[in-house]
Amino acid sequence: DIWGPTDVYGVRLPLPGDSQTVVFGQVLSGMKPTDPPVAGRKNNPLMPIAWTKSYQLPGQQSQKGKVFTTTMGSSNDFLSEGVRRLIVQGIFWACGLEKSIPLQGLRVDIVPPYHPTDFGFRSDEDWVNKNIKPGDFKQP
């Protein structure tokens, strides 16, 4: 169950190199996960919204790195447990920790309070007025 209100962004196909699509996105006719898909060109072809790829730095012939990429990740997308799990487990995979992911998946509970903001750009003043620091979210 992966759904977010962000758009399904178009990406250049085919994906480069050894990229492997993990999840395809579908444009829906509304803003609810239960809305039907849009017919026609918008979903043909379906666009990848999450994929993996390896890379190799120059001079590092014996080592390959792993990348997990997604076009999702707005603050509203994180309301979906499926989106949170996709991203967290994708990061575990990229770090070589996939064997530590249990069969039922990792817990990805939201650390309260969580108040996502709508899409848009914020002024510097907005962030100063919020006066939020990472330590404010430390769990007891």
Go through each PLM region and give its residues.
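Catalytic beta-strand/loop cores that center a nucleophilic Ser/Cys/Thr
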Residues: 1-62
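Active-site-proximal beta-strand/loop segments in catalytic clefts of secreted hydrolases
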Residues: 24-27, 70-74
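Active-site rim elements
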Residues: 37-41, 73-81
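Surface-exposed substrate-engagement region within the catalytic domains
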Residues: 43-46, 77, 88
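A short pocket-lining beta-strand/turn micro-motif at the edge of beta-sheets
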Residues: 47, 63-68, 76
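Long alpha-helical segments found as membrane-embedded helices
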Residues: 63-67, 98-140
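Cell-envelope and extracellular/periplasmic
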Residues: 72-73, 95-98
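Short amphipathic C-terminal alpha-helix that caps PH/PH-like domains
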Residues: 83-94
